[in-house]
UniProtKB/Swiss-Prot annotation:
One of its GO terms (molecular function) is structural constituent of ribosome. Coiled coil: none annotated. This is Large ribosomal subunit protein uL6. Keywords: Ribonucleoprotein, Ribosomal protein, RNA-binding, rRNA-binding. It comes from Paracidovorax citrulli (strain AAC00-1) (Acidovorax citrulli). SUPFAM superfamilies: Ribosomal protein L6 (SSF56053). This protein binds to the 23S rRNA, and is important in its secondary structure. It is located near the subunit interface in the base of the L7/L12 stalk, and near the tRNA binding site of the peptidyltransferase center. Pfam families: Ribosomal_L6. NCBIfam families: L6_bact. Belongs to the universal ribosomal protein uL6 family. GO terms for cellular component: cytosolic large ribosomal subunit. The lineage of its organism: Bacteria, Pseudomonadati, Pseudomonadota, Betaproteobacteria, Burkholderiales.
Length: 177
């Protein structure tokens, strides 16, 4: 059996988990998230913990038990604590400004780059060179951060661009004659 799938998911106070034939829904202070139920995984809710077991002994069922367990765990953590990604802008004149559900970037192009935030995602700019993305859905937070980073990824010679706050950019040496 999958090692990840063997671990139960603890449900904290204030989080409600609803399991139906079609989907698994998690509701908490951060909102409501749901994932499609998989026929290869049996879910048992006892004593405030969810256990995930493969429905049969196939490799696919074993793999899906770990996958569904981690998706449900991410939903439980998301609706209770939330997820956040931090981005830094490095470069002369590079700046970001968040206004409501919009993010405006000035990153060296002849035009500003605008992003509309999807529902359930908030963005803040504590400083003009720092972006903080928060939300309950881990996948959407990470995907939005990746899309913003893709506007101007860090270049290898000077390190200018948009990078994750914990990202290390290896600087290359320039060619010598």
């Amino acid at each position: 059996m999958s090692r990840v799938g063997k671990m139960p998911v603890a449900i904290p106070n204030g989080v409600d988990v609803t399991i139906t034939e079609e989907q698994i829904s998690v509701k908490g202070s951060g909102g409501t998230l749901s994932v499609a139920q998989n026929r290869l995984v049996k879910i048992v809710n006892k004593d405030g913990k969810l256990s995930f077991e493969p429905a049969d002994e196939s490799r696919e069922a074993n793999a899906m038990s770990g996958t569904i367990r981690q998706l449900v765990n991410n939903m439980v953590v998301g609706v209770s604590k939330g997820f956040e990604k931090k981005l830094n802008l490095i470069g002369v004149g590079y700046k970001a400004q968040a206004s409501g559900a919009k993010l405006n970037l000035a990153v060296g192009y002849s035009h500003p780059v605008n992003f509309d935030m999807p529902a359930g995602i908030t963005v803040a700019t504590p400083t003009p060179t720092e972006i903080v993305i928060k939300g309950a859905d881990r996948q959407r937070v990470g995907q939005l951060a990746a899309e913003i980073r893709a506007v101007r990824p860090p270049e290898p010679y000077k390190g200018k661009g948009i990078r994750y706050s914990d990202e290390k950019v290896t600087i290359k040496e320039t060619k010598k004659k």
